[in-house]
Amino acid sequence: MEQNLPFVNVGFIDNAYNDRVLPLLGKIDNGHLFKWFLVLIWKIAALAFLLGGVYLTIAGIFGDTGYIKMNITNELFSGGQKAGASFGLVIGLVLSLVCAWYLYSNTKKRTDELNSQEYGDLLHFIFLTMIPRTITLAGEIAFTLIMYAGLMQIIAGLDGAAAYAPLLSYGDLFMQIPGVNMAAALVPSSVHGNYDNFVNDMSMGIMGVAAAFFVLIAYYIYREIYNYGMKLVCALIAFLPRLALPIAIRKKAE
């Protein structure tokens, strides 16, 4: 046991030093603390998708600005529109809960994969291990939300009134996240339908579903470009010592 204070042994201080301080410094030195923190961020994000999604789904139904007040009991709507909005509520409630669960499950899977990766050093872990997986996860999140928006628009077009899509509010949040914000514009703030505009409503929904796949492909291409760029950087760094030696010899000869 290492002594903490100079010239004197104090049992509980020495115990705290050896049991708390030294192990923490060891985790910092070997990088386990950095890896734990980065993985923790992903774990929190996964839980936020699940709990936040459930909260938004339940909370958005009620209140003065809730779906029921704005669509089902709205005196400006006809009986047919209210019936359609009721159908949109049931389907939207189920799909929103499924979407929240899927976002959680997807993020949890990627978090487990990140946690299983070996930690060599901080730069390698961030730039070669974490960022490519972050790009993949961002693409999958964007794909899920755009697919969700497209399906909700199709439901709204079919019922001729509205569809309950509370998770569309995630689009405003993702506008602040680098990497995801470039697809956030494809997630509308709300979806509505009208039989007078049936063809356009259905076309928008189908285009949204198709766009989800194109966005996912774009993110995977983005990841491949990033990986290729990192290979070039690593190759350049490895080549620099070989380049420096002839230059040094030439300068010495001069």
Spans of features found by a protein language model:
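Membrane-interface extramembranous regions at the lipid-water interface
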Residues: 2-45, 72-83, 104-145, 241, ...
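Extended alpha-helical segments
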Residues: 2-5, 203, 207-254
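Membrane-interface segments at the starts/ends of alpha-helical transmembrane spans
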Residues: 28-39, 69-92, 126-129, 170-215
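Canonical alpha-helical transmembrane segments of integral membrane proteins
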Residues: 39-61, 139-153
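Membrane-helix interface motif
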Residues: 54-72, 150-180
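Hydrophobic alpha-helical membrane-embedded segments
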Residues: 86-108
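Juxtamembrane/interface segments at transmembrane-helix termini
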Residues: 101-113, 155-163, 221-240
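Terminal helix-to-tail segments of small alpha-helical proteins
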Residues: 134-165, 220-227, 253
